[in-house]
């Protein structure tokens, strides 16, 4: 080893020792012909004193050095309480430049704001800053904590293929040409879903993997085309068994940041979550639940409220908003695909004003504040129309109100299981939300096609009412994991495919290997996958998952560091068989 001691480990008890350190010049100060250098490396920072001006003259920020010298106690009054090494310094008698540094594109400092594009282009420099550096170290601890829990429960860590066949799972695949079979293609997996089910058929019983997954999605804020999930699958289990293991993992992870997660975690049905919060991932760090006003306005003359659903959410103190701000709410709603956001203002004397107040009856006005829980000085926002989009608009408004009115307790951790989700949803709803609907019928899977229905015998009689053994874990309004009890019978899987418009021939072509496996005594099984990037971002206290990924992509999947994706040469294109046709064309996929 070049170094004999970690710089950040030096303390008063090391005074008098001769040590060799190695690291980077984080900062330099000159005083009376003496150079004081903050030497930074993974363990921390220590001050190095260089009295030889000729040696110190050429040293600049981020030079990589090896320093040999004696550990001495700092003079009284010169201690630095902000450094763990602040009682001591190293007086150098030998300095070796291991590598010089060119002028920096930005300062290596946690106190200077740098544009994300520059940070990602020079990510290797960005990671020298303590914030990004600590985030990756936290990620490593998170990995270990999860492994420790699962190892105690006799789980087996197994790697599944990253070159497989294209099997629709709800998003577009990244495709890889197979050079040895021109015209044929591998796909990078969107998840290990089918392989982990096959491992249950294989008798592994308890599997996990910190898995890389790939989805070729349209650009969405804070999404990555390649991401990581903690993937877990268990045989001979029911929903409660999976949730108990998942909660044990969460307890271990949040303990890393000093928080005790109280278990068992609360549960709420999907239907209740949508009714009360307008979303299946509610943030429970604030109140302001949605209020159903459909029955209240059942006989209203106001045509806008003559709808299948009328709902409201209250903005505390919102009546004092100027007209310009109220108009801005309309634009906010239109950006979300709505026509606007109706409102009434509850004045200090209880009188209702605003556009809606002029269109409803005196009787409706008289009891509206009480019905919605509004107080004098509040604003009541409304949405009317089909239940799902109207609730979604109010749910988004609720969160926006929480942010604008400081209603969210930023220091709190709020966990919730959302259970009993629908098995199917209208295909039009899935495509409208940006998902790739699997199948060709009016119905597609809410989670994926391998989720077990709760009513195995009767789910296909009324697909729109069928419930799934599916569960999502929500933390502070973020979905951080989701899973289900899986289908383990060939006949049930075929019936689910049929509801989705996948006939037997297509099912065999795309999923024949899974259906074949189900013929050989497949055990009941279920599992969960945690969104690892999101969890680490929450634990690190950062807004973006890009901050906890070593080399993330920017918007649209572009990598500023390597300039990927990039064109390939004509020779590469020919060799890979990109334009070749397979010997036998496959039917078009959904």
UniProtKB/Swiss-Prot annotation:
Keywords linked to the UniProt accession: Aminoacyl-tRNA synthetase, ATP-binding, Cytoplasm, Ligase, Nucleotide-binding, Protein biosynthesis
Region named Aspartate: 193-196
Region described as Disordered: 556-590
InterPro entries named among the record's database cross-references: Aa-tRNA-synt_II (IPR004364), aa-tRNA-synth_II (IPR006195), aa-tRNA-synth_II/BPL/LPL (IPR045864), Asp-tRNA-ligase_1 (IPR004524), Asp-tRNA-ligase_1_N (IPR047089), Asp/Asn-tRNA-synth_IIb (IPR002312), AspRS_core (IPR047090), GAD-like_sf (IPR004115)
A Pfam family hit: GAD
Domain of life assignment: Bacteria
Binding site for L-aspartate: 169, 215, 447, 486
Compartments reported by the entry: Cytoplasm
Site (Important for tRNA non-discrimination): 31, 77
UniProt entry tagged with the keyword Cytoplasm: yes
SUPFAM superfamilies in UniProt: Class II aaRS and biotin synthetases, GAD domain-like, Nucleic acid-binding proteins
A biological-process GO annotation: aspartyl-tRNA aminoacylation
Residue sites binding ATP per the record: 215-217, 224, 479, 531-534
Keyword ATP-binding in record: yes
Enzyme category, top tier: ligase
EC code: 6.1.1.23
Cellular compartments per GO CC: cytoplasm
Catalytic reaction equation(s): tRNA(Asx) + L-aspartate + ATP = L-aspartyl-tRNA(Asx) + AMP + diphosphate
Listed GO MF terms: aspartate-tRNA ligase activity; aspartate-tRNA(Asn) ligase activity; ATP binding; nucleic acid binding
Entry similarity comment: Belongs to the class-II aminoacyl-tRNA synthetase family. Type 1 subfamily.
Subunit structure: Homodimer.
Function statement: Aspartyl-tRNA synthetase with relaxed tRNA specificity since it is able to aspartylate not only its cognate tRNA(Asp) but also tRNA(Asn). Reaction proceeds in two steps: L-aspartate is first activated by ATP to form Asp-AMP and then transferred to the acceptor end of tRNA(Asp/Asn).
NCBIfam families tied to this protein: aspS_bact (TIGR00459), PRK00476.1 (NF001750)
Protein's name in the database: Aspartate--tRNA(Asp/Asn) ligase
The species this protein was found in: Nocardioides sp. (strain ATCC BAA-499 / JS614)
Chain's gene name: aspS
